[in-house]
A protein has these predicted regions:
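Preference for long, amphipathic alpha-helical scaffolds in soluble/luminal domains
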Residues: 2-422
């Protein structure tokens, strides 16, 4: 799933996150030979860049929908893990692991999927171990180890730690925790008021101001709110997300207080307030802006914003985005044939406690037949809804019609006889 939004910052990191066509940044690179879709994998498109990503999202979403995936689907994901614990985006059957192809995004979502499935503790522990080993010295994570960290990858890694019940505050390099790494990318009180709480994709090596990024903000927000996939969405707050509290007097500008990192305690609410404002201003969706191209709806960022707001207990602020995705999401999912997009839409619907039957049915159809399915999860997706009378409603109506007809005939006959005797 390639996008120009992230290719400019870290070649393939965005490829797993947006579901859009490849951007011009790869125009000079020879196109790889499309990989054959292996048995057990959800979706029919080339898995080279998103195989582990879409499989992990599909397994997570279906498990939350009480669908027990086929052994081949689970086995494909576990078989992609390398001996050191990391996952690549995709590894052809029989191919050796290459540490240079392992990435934090694939590893993070695979860990969350296996936690959701249950029964894969050894693989989860190895995945968490890989994340710990490949954390940057500033506490962040890069898409590929050895590169500068970014907010999306750091947020996904923190999601995986939460899923594995590993406190991110205790996962550190050189004294910098995962929360410290996440804070590197969040705009604080030194930023303009309408940008506070947002996340930048990466920091400026020259020390310049952080630039808000829609996808980075949306994905980092789930981590800042203490969440992971799947989002339960059971906590409800009465108030809107609390914006970052800043002293805006002129004397405070440029002070150490205004330039201080956003604390972890305030981080989730601050980015939630930013996302809620952006959604309200953008017609209930976030926007992808790429240099040289017209702005377009950012389906991925909108979905992750809805997940984050649901996680932080603000379903009212997420509702508009959930509704928008319900109306427009088929464009993103290509009518339910894109496994990664369909799985993400299902995760959003689950977090918002919306009807999930159709999406569950679509996603189930994109992979191997499941071992077991909760009938209530897919009933409306596979057959017309039955009446509350247990399915005999049409026969009851026919019977009533016949009785009325017979009764009417008798009355007419009696009336004729009565007229004859008068």
């Amino acid at each position: 799933m390639l996008t120009a939004a992230r290719l400019g910052a870290a070649a393939l990191s965005a490829a797993l996150l947006t579901g859009l066509a490849a951007g011009p940044a790869l125009a000079d690179s020879p196109a790889p030979t499309p990989a054959a879709v292996p048995d057990g994998l959800y979706g029919k498109s080339d898995p080279t860049y998103d195989g582990v990503w879409r499989q992990s999202l599909a397994l997570t979403a279906l498990t939350a929908a009480k669908v027990t995936p086929a052994d081949s689907a689970v086995g494909w994901l576990t078989g992609q893990q390398c001996e050191d614990g990391g996952w690549p985006s995709y590894r052809a059957a029989g191919a050796a692991c290459d540490p240079k192809t392992e990435d934090s995004n694939a590893t993070a979502v695979a860990v969350q999927a296996l936690v959701a499935l249950g029964g894969h503790q050894e693989a989860v522990d190895k995945g968490v171990g890989w994340l710990k080993a490949n954390q940057n010295a500033d506490g962040s994570w890069a898409y590929n180890p050895g590169s500068p960290g970014d907010a999306d990858s750091t947020g996904l890694a923190v999601n995986a730690l939460f899923a594995a019940k590993t406190d991110p505050a205790g996962v550190a390099k050189a004294g910098r925790s995962a929360f410290d790494g996440l804070a590197l990318f969040q705009l604080g009180c030194a930023a303009p008021a309408d940008q506070r709480g947002a996340f930048a994709y990466q920091t400026d090596p020259a020390g310049g101001a952080l630039t808000p990024n829609a996808l980075a903000s949306a994905q980092a927000a789930l981590a800042a709110s203490g969440g992971h996939l799947p989002v339960a969405g059971t906590v409800h707050a009465d108030a809107a997300p609390k914006a970052l509290a800043c002293a805006d007097a002129p004397a405070a500008q440029g002070s150490s207080a205004s330039s201080a990192p956003v604390s972890h305690a305030e981080s989730g609410e601050a980015v939630g307030a930013y996302l809620a404002a952006q959604l309200a201003a953008g017609g209930d969706h976030l926007t992808l802006t790429t240099p040289g191209a017209a702005p377009t709806p950012d389906y991925t960022a909108t979905a992750w914003a809805a997940l984050a707001l649901s996680q932080s207990g603000h379903p009212q602020q997420a509702a508009g985005a959930v509704d928008w995705l319900g109306k427009e999401g088929a464009t993103w999912s290509k009518g339910g044939t894109d496994a990664g997009a369909t799985a993400t839409l299902l995760l959003v619907a689950q977090a918002a406690h919306r009807d999930t039957a159709a999406l569950t049915g679509q996603l189930t159809a994109l992979g191997p037949a499941p071992k077991a399915t909760d009938a209530s999860a897919t009933a409306t997706a596979t057959a017309p809804a039955k009446k509350k009378d247990g399915g005999i409603g049409q026969y009851w109506l026919i019977g009533v019609g016949l009785l009325i007809g017979v009764g009417g005939g008798l009355l007419l006959s009696l009336q004729r006889k009565r007229n004859t005797h008068l």
